[in-house]
């Protein structure tokens, strides 16, 4: 699993003392094509006219994504592509009016890695563009979840078409234990972990949705290497962060 974004480089140096395995771009490993009408809440966040991160439709005006995707970036450079099978064409491209990153976001450890943005014009919902409900309880260990995004595929190239992969939730305590390679300092109380043999999500998928039973349970945050059994994917826990999401969405 690659580290999801340049902001996590310090984290890798602290964790392993060696940044040689850091990948500048990542991928959904072991994924398959996902029709946008089967994940109509998925969006592509574009910065300087290219895909930067995934995002999730919360309402006609609000998108949820990872904090590190927007942190200290200029809103004038941001647009969101919605209702598109491909990140680089189709659907509707909407400018961003404003965004808010969680006040406790930590770019060093990627704790509280959550943000919301407000679109300049409201979306029109349809088969390929729709909001998703937020989970009210954190998923238990062993829950099957689906992650989607346009990150690089197994051949190392950015995927033009939306991809999906099925994973299983790993209990937070287990993820932070010596069974895996992170430790308690890196797996915060506001995170959940998920993994599967030969399947994973990485950099280009940051900010995208982790879904169970048609509810948003997580936001792709960070990890190390791709589909490495010792390093599960780490996601912002939507149930834990739900009060902040609702408040920020109403205030922005």
Curated annotation (Swiss-Prot):
Q: Which Pfam families match?
A: Trypsin
Subcellular location per the Swiss-Prot or TrEMBL entry: Secreted, Extracellular space
Q: Which SUPFAM superfamilies match?
A: Trypsin-like serine proteases
GO terms for molecular function, please?
A: serine hydrolase activity; serine-type endopeptidase activity
Q: Name one GO cellular component term.
A: extracellular region
Q: What is this protein called?
A: Trypsin iota
Record-linked InterPro entries: Peptidase_S1, Peptidase_S1_PA, Peptidase_S1_PA_chymotrypsin, Peptidase_S1A, Trypsin_dom, TRYPSIN_HIS, TRYPSIN_SER
Query: Gene encoding this chain?
Result: iotaTry
Please write the reaction equations for the catalytic activity of this protein: Preferential cleavage: Arg-|-Xaa, Lys-|-Xaa
Tell me the GO BP annotations in alphabetical order: proteolysis
Q: Where does the Peptidase S1 domain start and stop, copy by copy?
A: 28-250
Q: Any idea which residues are catalytic in this one?
A: 68 (charge relay system), 113 (charge relay system), 206 (charge relay system)
Q: Which UniProt keyword terms apply here?
A: Disulfide bond, Hydrolase, Protease, Secreted, Serine protease, Signal, Zymogen
Query: What residue range is the signal peptide?
Result: 1-19
Which pairs of Cys residues are joined through disulfide bonds in the record? 53-69, 175-193, 202-226
